[in-house]
Swiss-Prot record:
Cited Pfam families: PdxA (PF04166)
Name by which UniProt lists this protein: 4-hydroxythreonine-4-phosphate dehydrogenase
Gene this protein is translated from: pdxA
General remark: The active site is located at the dimer interface.
Any GO BP annotation: pyridoxal phosphate biosynthetic process
Annotated source species: Pseudomonas syringae pv. tomato (strain ATCC BAA-871 / DC3000)
Cofactor remark from the record: Binds 1 divalent metal cation per subunit. Can use ions such as Zn(2+), Mg(2+) or Co(2+).
Subcellular location: Cytoplasm
Amino acid sequence: MKPKRFALTPGEPAGIGPDLCLLLATQPQPYPLIAITSRDLLTQRAAQLGVAVSLLDVTPETLPDQPAPAGSLYVWHTPLAAPVETGVLNKANAAFVLQTLTRAGQGCLDGLFSGMITAPVHKGVINDGGIAFSGHTEFLAELTHTEQVVMMLATGDLRVALVTTHLPLREVADAITADRLERVTRILHADLVNKFGIAHPRILVCGLNPHAGESGHLGREEIDIIEPTLERLRSEGLDLRGPLPADTLFTPKYLEHCDAVLAMYHDQGLPVLKYKGFGAAVNVTLGLPIIRTSVDHGTALDLAGSANIDTGSLRVALQTAYQMAETHS
């Protein structure tokens, strides 16, 4: 069996991603963890934080089989395009951010890594740098030639997956088609089985409209699209309940009897999850041929370099990736 090792991308270099990597390196890890970033950036940020971390250089040809000792971090050096001023965005480094993601993602495809864990990027500055970018999820789908991926966040026993992700609200209803809903539901079900080890996943499905459309008086998407699609999938044996009004679904009566929730759009499902577990939640991309988890927060430019940050979400992202790799092996 191939040794398990994992890639870690710090994301936006001016944000807290480098800080998280360094603080994490002070704790022992069960598997080799390779930060794909600039060695100079980590050296600079460690000095700002007052953290003593030994940086151990590796290349694709010299990847380790054993975890680094606590207080050490493996680094696959990736050069910056411009010096980093902590807390200050610089569009000149947009391509650098994407290069780290490409190295990690391609490394997973090539079998160098068992999975990748990503710290937050800043979508705006990447686009300002002249590169069209809507998020990790979409970028990795393109890199891996995956037609459909699913964004899921989890904290504790609550998992919330999304039918649509980063769309303006006015475009959401048109994006919810029977084909998309069926593909997303199948991916969610399959990955709950294959990557999370849940033999018979129970999935609750939100309606799109208030009161799940109120029998068509507040919208017909539930009647025309959602219910017929769910019924077709139920006939194949999938355990699906819904469409349910979101404000009813997200109550203990329902959540106690499900393994995942499928929400129709970003701000329908994620506020509840983040209220329950912000700082202790993980973002998982389902449907990829690789394992990818991420933190549940942003770049926190104002906290970068201060050591006043919580590594909780990154630790959960790491633990989730480890567990998924163990289940999937």
